[in-house]
Amino acid sequence: MNIKQKIDNLRQEIDNWNYRYYVIYQPIVSDFEFDKKLKELEKLEAQYPEYYDYYSPTQRIGNDINNNFAQINHIYPMLSLSNTYSWEGINDFYNRIKKILNENFVIACELKYDGVSISLIYESGLLLRAVTRGDGTTGDDVTTNIRTVKSIPLKLYGNNYPRFFEIRGEIVFPWAAFNKINKERIENSEPPFANPRNAAAGTLKTLNPQVVSQRNLDAYLYQLLGDNLSSDSHYENLQLAQGWGFKVSNIIKCCKTIDEIENFINYWGKWKKSLPFAVDGVVLKVDSIRQQSLLGRIAKSPRWAIAYKFQSETVKTTLHSVDFQVGRTGIITPIANLEPVLLSGTIVKRASLHNEDIINALDLHIGDQCYVEKGGEIIPKITGINKEARLTFGNKAVNFPKNCPACNTPLIRFQNETAYYCPNYTQCKPQIKGMITHFASRKAMNINVGEETIETFYRAGLVRDIADLYEIKIDDILQLKRWAEKSAINFVESVQQSKQVPYERVLYGLGIHFVGEVVAKRLAKAFPTIEQLSIANNEQLTTIDGIGNQIAQSVIQYFSNENNLQLIRRLKLYGLQLFTIQKIFIDNKLAGKTFIISGIFRKYSRDKYKELIENNGGKNVSSLSAKTDFILSGVNMGPVKLIKAQRFGIKIISEDEFLKMIE
């Protein structure tokens, strides 16, 4: 046997041991024997570097530090699931599927893992890329870190897998590994992780793959995607994937009746704590991929799936105090400080009280015994008070402040709103810092600056509003403690680069109340310059799709303030994009043609297809009518659109047909 054959055999043997140990829990060698073989392989690879293989089991533990994570567009959007906490919600889902399909169907019931979603791309049996969910359209490339997760195969077994496919799953932090690392962190005087989900998410974003490899993350795969899948059954495809080396849970049941579904949910609701990982519900999926395609999707969720969330656990603890926090828009949020208590695997110290109405309804007093639960919210909430345990004297009632806790300005409350606001946004420190943080965020100006740095700049008097960022010089920063010249240069360059950010993102970054990313895009399209937007009236604004009186009044109020107008004049002076750059058509092959885009695409994203349509003289529309010329259809086109297209005689074209049109 030559050296190359010996190395190949060792790799194959260790891959097989890894699979048996981490995926199917059937180890066939001792840890000592495994480590011995791995060291032998490492030694041979070091002696014969010409036989290096990126997919060797020795390459699971990374040695390099990543400086950042690249942004990757998903081939298929990673949609979030609609969820329900009630049997009524399950029945509504089941009956809706029954009505739309009007044929027999099967529901696959699976556990809902409480971890981090991941998308894995394989080509020719090799792991090509691993991407986080991100915003559903774009995620972080965490391939280097995912390669250290031993239950994820770098090379697949067999040869009956598609040449190119995507498989999705959940990265979980098993309870044993989670408890072990928290014990170590406490012994090292480090703060423990709050829960396995947060720990898994933080670990995936760790810049050192060696740290990731030491934390023993696990992965369960739950959905196969691609053009050439072997079966129409979601369940059968997962069983095939298990044979290729993927870890697929055996806790899946194909149900034909609502009773079978409820039995599955009830069983695992009772026994969920016996599992080696955290779960927070059950996912129901229509098993047939053909039927999934017929059912399609709504805006952010597939119609063919729903998550049933287990009822939240409730605990009793003591209220010590209430903090009133000031957000970037001036909203005052009350937060309860509690006696630490264990709730659903998490140490809870704080709970949201939301607003004054809830405080009054609870009749809250300092020292009260509170009932706290953690449902679908990240921050737990107080749901009740044990008034019988309240002392007859000495308990101070919790009263909502009349003045801002940060700047002492009298608070205001708008009609039909539950929140109180501090109107002093030009001088209230938390609002100023929050506005600058929002303006600099990735989705807005993408300036390389964090909250701690903004705090440092604020204390030094370098910033009091968003425009001040463009006045900070390298010498100003070098006067501050712990700032090196390279860091100062990087910050200033990042600020200069932000001047190329398009108008709609600048508009979003201004932080106008109720103006999120989508609304900002619509405003920028309707009013191509900031000057036009600043003089728009209520009638002009409310004619825009998706903009009602509340948003319109907020925009008008923003531009009626002289401080804001002065701020915009400064931003314009510094060279920010406060106008829409008119697109120049590359071609006019689609001139006069209107398109609707529907479904999920493989070659390009929906946004890219919209751009191609406009660049070739076509027009994108959002609603289907007899005037629509084409529907550019991907996978999972909605059934309603299909029916309307047939009624209006609209031509439905595929990706390939569209691309031929613009060749």
Swiss-Prot record:
Active site: K112
A Gene Ontology BP annotation from the UniProt entry: DNA replication
Gene Ontology molecular function: DNA ligase (NAD+) activity; metal ion binding
Binding site for Zn(2+): C404, C407, C422, C428
Cellular component annotations (GO), alphabetically ordered: cytosol
Binding residue positions for NAD(+): D31, F32, E33, F34, D35, S80, L81, E110, R133, E170, K285, K309
Family assignment from sequence similarity: Belongs to the NAD-dependent DNA ligase family. LigA subfamily.
HAMAP family per the UniProt record, alphabetical: DNA_ligase_A
Name of the protein: DNA ligase
Gene: ligA
